[in-house]
Structure formats: C-alpha cells, structure tokens
C-alpha cells in the first residue's frame, strides 16, 4: 500500500437521495456496506474498507463513521507534501500589519489559504527561497458571501453588509504605497447587488490605474449570475487579467458549488471576457481530489482551451471544516506534474499545478508579468 493512502468510507445505510448528493460513485450491493473504489495511475491509492467499522488491523481510539458525505478516514494524516510551516518572515509580518491597519480583507486569510506565508513573504515560505515578489489577494465587497459553496471557508449570509463606498479608493492608495508591480483583486459573491459588484470592482481597478499606471491588475471574479453586461463593465475597466474559476468538472458542479453557479455559465463568462478586449489574458482554476476522473479533468481543460483561456491552475482540495465536503483523494505531486505537462500540450500559455497551488498562487511571478506585458506590447502597434 502507498505510504500515504486515502481511506474512503460511506455512512451506512445509504439512501438514494443521499447517494445523489454524494461524491461517491461505487457499485453498491444491497445488504453490504463494503465499497470498492478504483485507484488511479500515478495517484494515491484508495483502499477497500467497511463503512461501519475501523479498517482491519487498525485499532483507532474513538473511531466513528464519517458524516453523510464520502470522504477520507478522519483519523488519517495529511501526506507530507501538504504540510506547511507556520507563516513567518519580515515581509509577512509587515504586510499583515498594514492590511489590518487599513481594514482590508484578503482571501488569503478568509479562505484559510495554506500558502499565506509563502506568498506574503515573497516565496520565502515552504516553497523555498522564492523570488522576493510578495503577493496578496485583496478581497473587495466585504468578507461575507451570498453563496454557500461546499468547499469554501468564507462566511455566508443572504443579506451581507452594504459595500463600503470608500473601499475602492482606500484599496488603491494602499496598494500603490506598497510599491508592488502586480496585484490580485477578488471578491465574495454579491447576488444581493444589481450588478453583482461589478461596478465596485471596476472603480477599484480605475483608481489603481490612475494612481499607478504601470501596475498590472488581475481580477478574480464571481460569475455575476451570468450577467454579461456586468462582465463587460469590469473587463473594460483597465484590468490586465480576467480570472474566473470553473472550480471542478461538469458532473460535480451541483455537489461542489452553490446551485446558482454552473459549468456552462462559467465558460460563458470567461469567453465573453476574452472577447471584450483585445489582448485580454484569461485565467481559471480546477480543484482536484473531489471525486473527479482523469477523463473529466481532461475534458474540463479542453473546454477551457476551446474558449482560449490562457492560464490554468490546478490544486488539491483541502477540507476547511467538518461542515465542508470531505477529501476523496490526495493527488500526488507526480500526478500534478502530469497535469501541468498535459495542460501545456493543450496550448495553455502558463500552467501552475501542485498540491498547494491555488487560483492566486504566486500570481504576480515574473513569468505571468512578462506574459501580460508581452501581450500588451504585441497589441500596441495596432492601436497607433
């Protein structure tokens, strides 16, 4: 058995309605709680196990079956490749203090990102010596989302506080003062607003560009409920990279994401953003370990390339709390390397693939900066 295996259990008995909303896809036989899952090439083995008792030969104190969702053994430890040192470093401390004083939210904190120490300290965390480029993803429109995706740690409410009208200018002033060349702006979903928050996003981008014309701005957006006018408003605000995450494969959309999100809706948003502006760089992200098959991942990558998405990130899903979806599989670093090579073979200009990669992971690294600037330079002669 592999050194780091993911044991999968299912609560017994299993009702048809529970299975419909579950991530499991095994063959189930009446009167039996034993389930068999397929293993994947170059990936973590998933073992056969009984749903109502601990794995054979393992006396686990306090063992109990997991909740209604299929998932790994609650007593299993994360593989070594997912363990990170505690966030630290001079740049990290300075940036955290600055964000606190300015009352700015970051997705790094709110979504419990495992890379916060590495990104905020310019790559000096668990990722190695780094390149000195500190990256923080500013979260606009508050810290409360109107949607309830079952993978996300951000708090939710049907009626979040109204947007802060001064936030766009305050954010622009703060970011301009940091002396960075690349910034990522994201937001919670705001289905309570007529434009989904697109105008607030656009104001922030315009304010940033006025204060620091040379800065590169990436916006990681919601789907604005599929409102393409809202997409156009943001895409024409001066941003350089339009990012929207498809999150998972088609078959798992309703299980993983809020019902208001949809696979084709996300593709439509990305396609429209690409067509709104010549030279627009588009980007998306896929989580792995939720029960998807290799063929489904390949199809999702092909669908993204078919609408000319330039940048793709792939990372391991990690369960934020017991209330969220459980991890179905720990994907090995070697398999993530395979996905990187496969993505590059499809024509993505840049693929970041690894267990701890997230959609904004090291977004401002030099390769991405050079890619955006090169596209701008190629477009410049046509505008003269």
From Swiss-Prot:
Residues annotated to bind [4Fe-4S] cluster 1: 108, 113, 119, 360
Keywords on record: 4Fe-4S, Chloroplast, Iron, Iron-sulfur, Metal-binding, Plastid, S-adenosyl-L-methionine, Transferase, Transit peptide
Any one GO biological process: lipoate biosynthetic process
Comment on bound cofactor: Binds 2 [4Fe-4S] clusters per subunit. One cluster is coordinated with 3 cysteines and an exchangeable S-adenosyl-L-methionine.
Essential cofactor(s): [4Fe-4S] cluster
A GO cellular component annotation in the UniProt record: mitochondrion
Chain residues that bind [4Fe-4S] cluster 2: 145, 149, 152
Primary subcellular site in the record, as a coarse category: plastid
Pfam families in UniProt: LIAS_N, Radical_SAM
Transit peptide start and end: 1-48
GO molecular function: 4 iron, 4 sulfur cluster binding; lipoate synthase activity; metal ion binding
Location within or outside the cell: Plastid, Chloroplast
CDD domains: Radical_SAM
Positions of the Radical SAM core domain: 128-349
Reactions catalysed, as given in the entry: [[Fe-S] cluster scaffold protein carrying a second [4Fe-4S](2+) cluster] + N(6)-octanoyl-L-lysyl-[protein] + 2 oxidized [2Fe-2S]-[ferredoxin] + 2 S-adenosyl-L-methionine + 4 H(+) = [[Fe-S] cluster scaffold protein] + N(6)-[(R)-dihydrolipoyl]-L-lysyl-[protein] + 4 Fe(3+) + 2 hydrogen sulfide + 2 5'-deoxyadenosine + 2 L-methionine + 2 reduced [2Fe-2S]-[ferredoxin]
Superkingdom classification of source: Eukaryota
Pathway: Protein modification; protein lipoylation via endogenous pathway; protein N(6)-(lipoyl)lysine from octanoyl-[acyl-carrier-protein]: step 2/2
Enzyme Commission number(s) from the entry: 2.8.1.8
Cross-referenced PANTHER family: LIPOYL SYNTHASE, LIPOYL SYNTHASE, CHLOROPLASTIC
Similarity annotation: Belongs to the radical SAM superfamily. Lipoyl synthase family.
Protein name from the UniProt record: Lipoyl synthase 2, chloroplastic
Gene source species: Oryza sativa subsp. japonica (Rice)
Gene expressing this chain: LIP1P-2
